[in-house]
């Protein structure tokens, strides 16, 4: 993913939004921070659905999340507490704010599929890393 971030930076992208979920979001955030060491103008913006997002995660994942949050240029908390649909609303807020969506998607149903559909409806550019 570092190569993707490097290529996007070469195209003029400097601000990267991240939902901070486990898995690909975490890898993407780490990639932005790695490239930021060479290109300090890069900004990582955490888009968190609610403060309790990591509460049920294993301790190692919570620690990794905390380290990543501490390194973010900005943290946007979208809702004060968990509620049904807050993850979807976070995803839509990211799609609304983004010029380009970098996606990792296996073709199955769920939040990623819904966000890709939403972004397409909004005319957003999508860069799929895996379909």
Region locations from a protein language model:
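Acidic/glycine-enriched connector segments
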Residues: 1-131
């Amino acid at each position: 993913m570092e190569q993707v971030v490097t290529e996007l930076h070469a195209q003029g992208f400097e601000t990267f939004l991240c939902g901070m979920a486990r898995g690909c979001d975490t890898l993407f955030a780490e990639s932005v921070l790695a490239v930021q060491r060479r290109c300090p103008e890069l900004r990582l913006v955490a888009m968190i659905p609610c403060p309790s997002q990591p509460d049920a995660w294993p301790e190692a994942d919570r620690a990794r999340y905390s380290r990543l949050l501490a390194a973010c240029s900005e943290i946007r908390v979208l809702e004060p507490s968990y509620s049904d649909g807050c993850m979807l609303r976070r995803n839509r807020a990211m799609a609304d704010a983004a010029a380009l969506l970098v996606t990792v998607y296996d073709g199955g149903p769920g939040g990623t599929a819904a966000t890709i559909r939403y972004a397409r409806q909004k005319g957003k550019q999508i860069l799929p890393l895996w379909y």
